[in-house]
C-alpha cells in the first residue's frame, strides 16, 4: 500500500518491564499479596512504542533520544537492536536515570506498577539538536513523541521544528502537558479531547466547543493541520472547517497505545505523500486494529487492508491462537471477564450460534476451545469430523461474538483451562448434575440450554437419509 520511507522518531524512550507471576496467598507480614514470579519480559515503551508501530507499517525507522548510563538504558538499546533500529542518534547522559516502568502481573491482573526515571530536562540539548540536524535531510517525516520525561524541551522542539519547516519535512507531535507553545509551527499535533481541553482551557462537551478548541490550537500554534482524537467517535480535523472522521473499531478491548498508533500512521502516510484526509482514514483503521487487541499492540498494513476490505471488519485468522499465545494475551486482560466453552463444532448450526452468543453475554471475551481432528475421532468415531479442524476454526472465527479460538488435542480441555484460567466456564444444560471438567479452576460455571431439535448428529442423519432416498 505504501513505500519503505525513512522516518525519524525523537522523544522519551522507555522500557516496559513485566514481571509475570501467580498469587496464591496473603503475606503474614502485611495485608498484601505474595506473588511467585514465573518469568519476566521487556518491551519498548514511550517513543519506543511509536518506533514499533512504524516498523509494523513497514517504515525504515531511526530514533533520537537521551538515555542514562544505566542498565535500563542498555536494555533499551538491546531491544532496539533486536528490531534492527540503530542507536547512532541516541546520546548517553552520565548520572541520568533511564525510564523504566515495572509492572507486577498476577492472575491476569496488574498488582502494582513501579516507576524509576528522570523527569528533569536533559543536559545534552545542544548535542541532541546537532545530531538531529546533521541527519534531518535523510528523512521524509519526523515524529516527536513527548512523554514529559525531559528529552523534548522547548529548545529541542523549536530547533527541530524550525529546521523541518526549512526543509519542508512534515513534523508531527504527540504532545504532553498544558503548555503547547513549544510545538509552534509544527505540521500537526495529536492531542486527545482531555489534553486539548487542558491546553485551550475550554471544556469540550459538544461539537461547537470541539470546533472552538481545535480552531484555537491551529491559530495560536500556527499548525498546518489541527487534529484532536475523540476516542470512540474517531478523529477531528480542522483545516478551514471542522471535519469528523468516524472511528472504525467494531470492538474495543484495550486502548493502550492507540495514540502512538495514530501518530505513527499519520506520519507514515504523510511521508508517503498522502493528503491529510486519506492519512486520517488510514489512521482510524489502524487504531481500530490495535484497540481490538490487548496491551500496547501495533497494526500492520495487511491487517489494515483486511479491515478495509472486509464487510464485517473481522480479521479471522488473528482469532486463532496457540495455547501459549492465548495464555500471554489473557495475562494482560485487566478487569475483563473471560468466558470459556469448548466443543467439536463439526457442522456449525443455529443451535451452536445461539449457544455461543449467549455465552458471550456472560463476560467481555469469549474463548472457544476446539477439539482437534484426532480428539474428535477418539470421541465421535473414525467417520468424524466431517470438517477439518482448520475449517471448523475458520467458521467459528467468523462469528463476531467469538474473540479467540484455540485448538486442543486432549479428550478434555482441562490442561487448556488450567493454563488460561477463565473466569466463567460454560457448558450445555445436559451437564446438569454431572461433573464439569475444570469447574474447580474457574470462579463460575454456567449451563446454557440447547436449541431443541438442533444437533450435528441430526444434520448428518438427515443428509444420509436424503442420499438414501435419492438412490431409491
Curated annotation (Swiss-Prot):
GO cellular component: cytosol
Record-listed E.C. numbers: 2.7.1.167, 2.7.7.70
Sequence positions that bind ATP: 192-195
Pfam entry (one): PfkB
Record protein name field: Bifunctional protein HldE
Organism from which the protein derives: Campylobacter concisus (strain 13826)
Gene name of this polypeptide: hldE
Catalytic residues, chain numbering: 260
Cytidylyltransferase: region residues: 340-472
Pathway where it operates: Nucleotide-sugar biosynthesis; ADP-L-glycero-beta-D-manno-heptose biosynthesis; ADP-L-glycero-beta-D-manno-heptose from D-glycero-beta-D-manno-heptose 7-phosphate: step 1/4; Nucleotide-sugar biosynthesis; ADP-L-glycero-beta-D-manno-heptose biosynthesis; ADP-L-glycero-beta-D-manno-heptose from D-glycero-beta-D-manno-heptose 7-phosphate: step 3/4
GO molecular function (one): heptose-1-phosphate adenylyltransferase activity
Amino acid at each position: 500500500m505504501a513505500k519503505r520511507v525513512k522516518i525519524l522518531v525523537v522523544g522519551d524512550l522507555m522500557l516496559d518491564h513485566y514481571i509475570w507471576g501467580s498469587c496464591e496467598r496473603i503475606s503474614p507480614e502485611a495485608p498484601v499479596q505474595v506473588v511467585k514470579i514465573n518469568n519476566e519480559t521487556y518491551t519498548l515503551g514511550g517513543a519506543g512504542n511509536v518506533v514499533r508501530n512504524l516498523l509494523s507499517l513497514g517504515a525504515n525507522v531511526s530514533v533520537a533520544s537521551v538515555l542514562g548510563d544505566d542498565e535500563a538504558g542498555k536494555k533499551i538499546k538491546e531491544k532496539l537492536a533486536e528490531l534492527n533500529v540503530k542507536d547512532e542518534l541516541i546520546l548517553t547522559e552520565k548520572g541520568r536515570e533511564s525510564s523504566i516502568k515495572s509492572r507486577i502481573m498476577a492472575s491476569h491482573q496488574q498488582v502494582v506498577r513501579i516507576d524509576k526515571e528522570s523527569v528533569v530536562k536533559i543536559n545534552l540539548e545542544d548535542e541532541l539538536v546537532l545530531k538531529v540536524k546533521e541527519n534531518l535531510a535523510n528523512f521524509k517525516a519526523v515524529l516527536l513523541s513527548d512523554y514529559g520525561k525531559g528529552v523534548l524541551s522547548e529548545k529541542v522542539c523549536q530547533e527541530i521544528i524550525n529546521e523541518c519547516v526549512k526543509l519542508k519535512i512534515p513534523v508531527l507531535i504527540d504532545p504532553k502537558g498544558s503548555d503547547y507553545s513549544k510545538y509552534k509551527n509544527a505540521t500537526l499535533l495529536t492531542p486527545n479531547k482531555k489534553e486539548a481541553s487542558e491546553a485551550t482551557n475550554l471544556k469540550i462537551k459538544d461539537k461547537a466547543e470541539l470546533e472552538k478548541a481545535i480552531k484555537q490550537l491551529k491559530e495560536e500554534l500556527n499548525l498546518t493541520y489541527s487534529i484532536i482524537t475523540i476516542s470512540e467517535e474517531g478523529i477531528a480535523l480542522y483545516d478551514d472547517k471542522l471535519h469528523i472522521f468516524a472511528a472504525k473499531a467494531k470492538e474495543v478491548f484495550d486502548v493502550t497505545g492507540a495514540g502512538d498508533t495514530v501518530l505513527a500512521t499519520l506520519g507514515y502516510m504523510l511521508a508517503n505523500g498522502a493528503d491529510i484526509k486519506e492519512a486520517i482514514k488510514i489512521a482510524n483503521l489502524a487504531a481500530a486494529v490495535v484497540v481490538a487487541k490487548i496491551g500496547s499492540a501495533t497494526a500492520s498494513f495487511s491487517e489494515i487492508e483486511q479491515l478495509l476490505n472486509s464487510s464485517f471488519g473481522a480479521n479471522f485468522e488473528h482469532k486463532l491462537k496457540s495455547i501459549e499465545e492465548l495464555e500471554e494475551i489473557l495475562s494482560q486482560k485487566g478487569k475483563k471477564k473471560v468466558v470459556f466453552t469448548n466443543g467439536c463444532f463439526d457442522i456449525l448450526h443455529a443451535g451452536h450460534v445461539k449457544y455461543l452468543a449467549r455465552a458471550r453475554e456472560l463476560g467481555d471475551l469469549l474463548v472457544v476451545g476446539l477439539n482437534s481432528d484426532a480428539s474428535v475421532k477418539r470421541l465421535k468415531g473414525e467417520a468424524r469430523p466431517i470438517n477439518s479442524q482448520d475449517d471448523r476454526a475458520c467458521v467459528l472465527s467468523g462469528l463476531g461474538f467469538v474473540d479467540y479460538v484455540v485448538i486442543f488435542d486432549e479428550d478434555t480441555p482441562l490442561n487448556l483451562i488450567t493454563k488460561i484460567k477463565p473466569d466463567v466456564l460454560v457448558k450445555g444444560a445436559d451437564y446438569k448434575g454431572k461433573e464439569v471438567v475444570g469447574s474447580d479452576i474457574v470462579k463460575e460455571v454456567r449451563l446454557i440450554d440447547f436449541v431443541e431439535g438442533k444437533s450435528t448428529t441430526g444434520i448428518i442423519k438427515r443428509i444420509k437419509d436424503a442420499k438414501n432416498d435419492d438412490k431409491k
